[in-house]
Structure formats: structure tokens, C-alpha cells
UniProtKB/Swiss-Prot annotation:
GO molecular function, one term: oxidoreductase activity
Enzyme Commission identifier(s): 1.1.1.-
Swiss-Prot/TrEMBL keywords: NAD, Oxidoreductase
Protein name: NADH-dependent oxidoreductase ucdB
Length: 285
């Protein structure tokens, strides 16, 4: 994701060149730099921060975000703008914003929705929150939603709720149809007629073709479980009823148990099939 985003910033963002890159695995940054050109790989995170006015981060999980900012905060960062496109919980985003502000720096939370293919095609949905002046500095790329950084993460989590509910709905529809003796082809036609556009069409294709069991994952189930954990925490904190989401998360756990942590998120279909007395996968040896 970060590689696709940095490529688009370089190609279309009218940024100063060379673009400074940093990755904890230096070999990845070197290979990415060689492929793109007009890039410079920093030897360390503080070195990357020191020569940059805007520092854009996209990290794997909340632990990586917290560790990275622990390394950044002692440096001279006054007047620098940090844009974080990682997915954390809202409290973490607000805490980082406060700590950066105490050091005279600025922060925009910019979680994104969509996988690497959408990032490459410049089709990600970006949700920005931060003080107005900071958001204005990156406005050529996004539309802001407010001044509290945690608001962006809340919207990202709500977006994930919609995604998981959609996957669960499509999976249950297919399993229901099969148990009733409806041919997969006819159910596919119905879904494409009623919901011809993404996301329903995308998840339907994954399930009908069997790619949810054997293809390259849209999102690994292990990462989906991390994110759904944040959503469940938010729902519990605010007293919200999210029963369909709870069921979808339980199905993710079943997927991980049966197909491993790298299985696709849409293999929820397999969990629903098992509960309906069908084989987990539609693919036969």
C-alpha cells in the first residue's frame, strides 16, 4: 500500500525531488527507489524526518505506529507535518496528535479505504482529520472531515463495518441459495442484476470463481481480524449493537482456523458454507 501511494505522490503529487523514502527493511526501500527513480533512501528514520517538511507514513499495525513515533518524537520536528495513513484506534491518533503538538509539529490522520490495486489506480478513499491549516497542505489529494484526528479513524472503522457486513451478506446469500438447490450461475446473475457495482460485485466474483479460496487475497484474514478488533472495541465503548459484524468476525476466526492467516477475507464464504453443512471450499482436487 505504501509503495503504491508513494509512487503516486512522486508521479502526480508535484512534490520536491528526490522523494525521500524510508522502510525498516532497507532492501525494500532500495528496490522501490530503483524502480521509481527520482528517490533517495534515508539511512534511518530520524534522517528521513530531518530533511522533510511533510512526512507521510503507512505502517502495518498499531504497534508499528507507536514504535515509529516513539523514535520520531525526540528529534527536532518543529513545524513539520506528519500524515499517517496507517490504521490505528481513534485514541492512538489523538494521543499522537497531542504529543506532536507539544513538540511544535502538526498531524493529520489520513486512513485510506481500498487495497493496493486501488492505490495504484489512484482510486483510494481517503479520510482526513486534523487542524484546518494542516489538512489544507495536503488538500490537493483528499477531502477533510473535521479537526479531531480520531474522527478519521472512526470513519475508517465505520467503513470497515460496511465492508464486513456486505461480505457476510453475499456469503450467506450464496450458501442459502445452494442449500435451496439454486444453481450458482443463477444466484450470480441475480446478484449482478441487483448489485452490479462494487463492493457487492467484487465480493460476488471472488466467491463465484473460487478466488476467495485460491487466489491472491484482497485482504489477509489476519489483518482483517486486527481491524475488526478495533471496531468491536469502539462498538463496546459506545454501547452500539453490531450483531451482523460480530457474526462476520466470528466467521473470520473460522477462516483463519481452516485456511490460515494469509487466507482472503472473502473466504468468510467458506465459514458460512461449513455452518450450512457444506464443504469449506468450492474447489475440488
Amino acid at each position: 500500500m505504501g509503495m503504491a501511494m508513494s509512487e503516486n505522490l512522486l508521479r502526480y503529487g508535484n512534490v520536491a525531488k528526490p522523494l525521500v523514502l524510508y522502510n525498516r527493511t532497507r532492501e525494500k526501500a532500495e528496490a522501490h527507489s530503483s524502480r521509481l527513480g527520482d528517490c533517495e533512501v534515508a539511512n534511518s528514520l530520524p534522517a528521513a524526518v530531518s530533511v522533510s517538511d511533510i512526512i507521510w507514513l503507512c505502517l502495518q499495525d498499531q504497534t508499528a505506529v507507536e514504535e515509529t513515533f516513539q523514535e520520531i518524537l525526540p528529534a527536532e520536528i518543529r513545524s513539520k507535518l506528519f500524515v499517517d495513513s496507517s490504521t490505528t484506534n481513534p485514541e492512538t491518533a489523538d494521543s499522537i496528535a497531542r504529543r506532536l503538538s507539544d513538540r511544535g509539529a502538526f498531524f493529520v490522520a489520513l486512513p485510506v479505504m481500498g487495497g493496493p490495486p486501488l492505490a495504484l489506480s489512484r482510486s483510494l478513499t481517503c479520510i482526513a482529520s486534523g487542524d484546518r491549516e494542516s489538512v489544507d497542505r495536503i488538500r490537493p489529494y483528499i477531502e477533510g472531515v473535521g479537526e479531531k484526528p480520531g474522527a478519521a479513524l472512526l470513519l475508517k472503522l465505520l467503513g470497515n463495518f460496511l465492508i464486513m457486513a456486505t461480505i457476510e451478506t453475499v456469503a450467506e446469500a450464496h450458501a442459502f441459495a445452494e442449500k435451496c438447490g439454486i444453481d450458482t450461475t443463477n444466484m450470480d446473475k441475480l446478484l449482478r442484476a441487483v448489485f452490479p457495482l462494487p463492493p457487492h460485485a467484487l465480493y460476488n466474483r471472488q466467491m463465484v470463481t473460487g478466488e476467495c479460496f485460491s487466489g491472491k487475497p484482497l485482504v489477509e484474514v489476519s489483518k482483517a481480524l486486527q481491524l475488526t478488533g478495533h471496531v468491536m472495541e469502539m462498538a463496546k465503548k459506545h454501547g452500539a449493537s453490531v450483531k451482523i459484524y460480530e457474526i462476520a468476525r466470528q466467521h473470520l476466526e473460522i477462516v483463519q482456523e481452516n485456511a490460515g492467516p494469509d487466507a482472503d477475507i472473502t473466504a468468510i464464504y467458506g465459514a458460512v458454507r461449513m455452518e450450512s453443512g457444506l464443504p469449506f471450499s468450492t474447489i475440488t482436487e
